[in-house]
């Protein structure tokens, strides 16, 4: 039988893995076809960078959620912090569905703006429970900020 903390870590990794899998499923078929044909801004990173970047970010997200949950549901702010985390996780998966699956940079942009706000809220709530957990999400908000600019530029260039 798994210890309570190991069980929590497995659930956190599983939740993040599910979100990333949904995103990957929506993305993988569109990259060599639709996405490759889009006009992109000069600051578009090389395609090979996205996989390692998201892998690291998803790992940090899972560990951050675990650090919050490790405090226990009875600790102040834990339930709210994890609820907001789950909201942003759903929005994260939906971005790939909107942008790549539906091939809609506009829907992706709307989603990523709401996602950005949800990540900021998650960071605030995580900091209140666990400073290391909040710090672990700072690269995530930085990357999503960049991704939002990239999304907006792709929308503008392909209208």
Protein language model regions, located:
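Terminal transmembrane helical module of multi-pass membrane proteins
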Residues: 125-159
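Hydrophobic alpha-helical segments of small multi-pass membrane proteins
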Residues: 82-91, 95, 109-122, 140-145
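Helix-coil boundary and interhelical linker segments in multi-pass alpha-helical membrane proteins
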Residues: 1-10, 66-80, 125-133, 159
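Membrane-interface helix caps and helix-loop-helix hairpins in membrane proteins
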Residues: 75, 95-106, 127-131, 156-157
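Membrane-interface loop-to-helix entry segments
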Residues: 45-60, 104-115
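Cytosolic, membrane-interface loops and tails of multi-pass inner-membrane proteins
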Residues: 30-44
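Helix-adjacent hinge/juxtasegments
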Residues: 59-96
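N-terminal signal-anchor transmembrane alpha helix
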Residues: 2-26
């Amino acid at each position: 039988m798994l210890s309570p903390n190991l069980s929590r870590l497995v659930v956190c990794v599983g939740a993040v893995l599910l979100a990333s899998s949904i995103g990957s499923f929506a993305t993988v078929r569109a990259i060599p076809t639709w996405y490759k044909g889009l006009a992109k801004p000069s600051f578009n990173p090389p395609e090979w960078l996205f996989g390692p970047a998201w892998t690291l970010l998803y790992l940090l997200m899972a560990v951050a959620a675990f650090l919050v949950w490790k405090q226990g549901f009875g600790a102040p702010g834990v339930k709210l912090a994890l609820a907001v985390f789950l909201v942003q996780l759903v929005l994260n998966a939906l971005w790939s569905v909107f942008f790549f699956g539906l091939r809609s940079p506009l829907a992706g942009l709307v989603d990523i703006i709401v996602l950005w706000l949800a990540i900021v809220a998650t960071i605030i709530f995580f900091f209140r429970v666990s400073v290391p957990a909040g710090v672990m999400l700072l690269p995530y908000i930085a990357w999503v900020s960049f991704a939002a600019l990239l999304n907006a530029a792709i929308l503008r260039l392909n209208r």
